Design a protein with these regions (language model features):
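An N-terminal hydrophobic leader/cap segment in hydrolases
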Residues: 1-25, 34
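Serine-hydrolase catalytic machinery in alpha/beta-hydrolase-like enzymes
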Residues: 21-124, 169-173
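Proline-centered loop/turn at the N-terminus of a beta-strand
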Residues: 73, 128-130, 153, 183
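Short beta-strand immediately N-terminal to the catalytic nucleophile in serine-hydrolase-like folds
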Residues: 131-133, 157
């Protein structure tokens, strides 16, 4: 007998999809990106799927596959690749201190720009670009929507609007909220 939560876990299959890791090089750094898209299709709308602090794990990959099943080219980049493996830390406090707080916002924006360029060159239609993210990734949704005017829609799942400004995270979503043009 499984706990109720385990009984309701969604596990989207790969049938009809190309779903695998691709490597995108950003300023000399190889960034792993989980890609899911309908097999043999091009001119696909593009959705960037941004993880919470735990990185690209099975749930994030599953979300990408769900979007692919709906006809999207979904990309979930490992935005912490330079800082370390989020799964290697025993507590959230350690993870925040050693990995998340060390990921500079400009680096994250560059990585996402590179994902968009890769999508454009690999069957994606970036005139139909969206972004969604969870918790830490929700914050990134706000920032990237302000950064890239090509974003047509953004959905932040419980992303923080306010936070401590640091040299690596100098702007918070509340600072740019009034200027956003993206729904």
């Amino acid at each position: 007998v499984l706990p109720v939560a385990a009984q309701s876990v969604i596990d989207t299959d790969n049938a009809g999809l190309t779903a695998n890791e691709v490597i995108i090089t950003v300023k000399g750094q190889k960034v792993p990106v989980y890609r899911a898209q309908p097999q043999g299709k091009t001119n696909l709308p593009v959705i960037l799927v941004i993880s919470e602090i735990f990185g690209v794990h099975e749930h994030i990959a599953d979300v990408a596959r769900r979007f692919a099943k709906q006809g999207y080219l979904a990309l979930a980049p490992d935005l912490f690749v330079r800082q370390g493996d989020p799964g290697a830390y025993g507590t959230v406090a350690e993870l925040m201190k050693e990995v998340v707080s060390k990921a500079p916002d400009p680096q994250v924006m560059d990585d996402l720009d590179a994902c968009v360029a890769w999508a454009r060159d690999n069957g994606g239609n970036i005139d139909r670009l969206g972004i969604t993210g969870f918790c830490w990734g929700g914050r990134i949704v706000w920032l990237y929507s302000a950064h890239n005017p090509q974003v047509k829609a953004g959905v932040a799942w419980y992303g923080r609007l306010v936070g401590n400004k640091t040299p690596l995270a100098p702007v918070q979503p509340i600072d740019i909220a009034a200027t956003l043009k993206t729904p």
